[in-house]
Amino acid sequence: MKNPITKFAAAAVIITAITLGLFEFIDTGSQSGVVWAEVAQNVEASQGVIWRLRETGSRDPNDDWPNSYMITWRSPAITRTDRYRGGQIWRTIYYNLDTKTVIGVLHDVQRYHKEAMSDERVQSVRADKDRWTTSQSLINHLLARKHHSLDQKMIDGVLCEGIETTDASGLPVKSFTARGWVSVETGYPVLGEIEIIDDGGIRHTTTLDQFQWNVDLSASDVEPEIPTDYEPL
């Protein structure tokens, strides 16, 4: 059975993939102020990004929506995800592909785990990230889905334009809706929304916001500090 760190790490990789992938829609026929091809280029070129993710519909009875959320820092070599519950940090997972290191911290039980990553694991993590952040492969995937433009609207004081798909073909769900909202001024994503009804009829929602793009993320700033009273897992 996977330990809590391994399960959280796997979930964090999937969420990271979905997060950046959502915004690489392209609407080549759009007449709006946003050039979606440039949005995809902006996302791919950003050397560092930070965002918040909130979810509903989890089957985990310990989740405490709306007080549960995740903050992720990501650069080409580094990914860190902090999960919060009840306003307190609960779990941290950190990957450094340059040093081939993974660190997991279980703040709720004051335990941690640190290990070296094999070359195979580094390649696996990098492949999971590249599958969604390389514009060519992801764009080809998303262009296969029907999508349409949304009217402009203000989001947190920022004028945004959006795009939406409800094409659930090939997905193991009853229904699927994904929306990406981009700043008209900067061409960077501001908000992402995903709504799914699974085969069991349970509605799941994911909200991605509080984006910071082109952030200089160094390992010294992002690597989690392990309190001295935490014990090895």
Language-model features: where?
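An acidic-aromatic
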Residues: 66-132, 195-207
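Edge/loop elements at the starts and ends of beta-strands within beta-rich repeat scaffolds
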Residues: 43-48, 74, 98, 156-158, ...
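A short, Trp-centered hydrophobic/proline-enriched beta-strand micro-motif
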Residues: 43-62, 78-81
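Non-transmembrane domains of secretory- and envelope-associated proteins
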Residues: 7-22, 141-161, 169-178, 184-233
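Non-cytosolic head/periplasmic domains of membrane-anchored proteins
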Residues: 101-175
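Generic short beta-strand segments
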Residues: 49-59, 164-169, 194-195
